[in-house]
């Protein structure tokens, strides 16, 4: 049985109902990734990314004396994923917990809401994290909100974040992003 948002088997077979968003190959769309670290709020965490042929490497160090997070985010997108149930990530982790972040047109007090869902990684092993849209929690600057629920028809951005209340180095390789 697959538990949503946790590593599952290493199969690369895809059914007809999956949608490849990127696999970081030269023919894959450039999602315009950029870094947002906790230094935007006085923190000391550091993180960066490097795209290679067939993967994106996100690495750095978190420091909980401040914001305690590092993230990468895509440029603004317009995705209708309403025919799908969630996001599937192919990752090689370090045993730490990561957060997948989606944004939509939803607003709270006039500001953009982001939606977070955590997933676990296996140290040094490739795994697949399947995260159903129903697991994404609305947040504003980390504060959990009562609503609105994520509307997969209006995805405007995505990102990867480490925010697990641990100090120290992190490294995650991301091979593909699918909607399933």
Language-model features: locations:
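Beta-rich carbohydrate-recognition modules and glycan-binding surfaces
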Residues: 2-180
């Amino acid at each position: 049985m697959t538990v949503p948002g946790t590593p599952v088997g290493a199969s690369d077979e895809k059914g007809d109902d999956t949608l490849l968003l990127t696999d970081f190959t030269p023919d894959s769309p450039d999602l315009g990734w950029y870094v947002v670290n906790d230094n935007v709020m006085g923190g000391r965490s550091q993180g960066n990314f490097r795209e290679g042929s067939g993967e994106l490497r996100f690495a750095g160090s978190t420091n909980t004396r401040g914001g305690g997070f590092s993230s990468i985010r895509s440029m603004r997108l317009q995705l209708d994923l309403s025919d799908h149930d969630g996001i599937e990530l192919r990752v090689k982790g370090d045993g730490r917990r990561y957060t997948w972040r989606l944004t939509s047109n939803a607003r709270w007090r006039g500001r953009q809401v982001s939606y977070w869902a955590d997933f676990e990684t296996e140290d040094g092993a490739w795994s697949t994290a399947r995260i159903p849209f129903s697991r994404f929690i609305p947040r504003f600057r980390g504060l959990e909100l009562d609503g609105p629920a994520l509307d997969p028809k209006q995805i405007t951005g995505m990102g990867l974040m480490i925010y697990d209340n641990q100090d120290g180095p992190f490294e995650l390789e991301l091979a593909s992003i699918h909607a399933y």
